[in-house]
Amino acid sequence: HQQFHCAAAEGQAKKSFSCKYCEKVYVSLGALKMHIRTHTLPCKCHLCGKAFSRPWLLQGHIRTHTGEKPFSCQHCNRAFA
């Protein structure tokens, strides 16, 4: 963290990471890798083929197929996905 700020203070060029799919630029490789998932959509539903960038989004989508509703209201007991 400190190296990043010290390099900037000394006038050195900051390293940047560009997305090959769009024009977005990031200051860390990790941030770029997370962004690239929005283009590659690596989490694919085996039932319908719909693709998602994050596993938890796929998990929520799977519930549309299974009908699972793991969350319920404490007051009325109505269930939600």
From Swiss-Prot:
GO terms for cellular component: nucleus. The keyword Transit peptide does not apply. Keywords: DNA-binding, Metal-binding, Nucleus, Repeat, Zinc, Zinc-finger. GO terms for molecular function: DNA-binding transcription factor activity, RNA polymerase II-specific; RNA polymerase II cis-regulatory region sequence-specific DNA binding; zinc ion binding. InterPro entries: Snail/Krueppel_Znf, Znf_C2H2_sf, Znf_C2H2_type. SUPFAM superfamilies: beta-beta-alpha zinc fingers. Its main location: nucleus. The keyword DNA-binding applies. It is found in: Nucleus. This is Escargot/snail protein homolog.
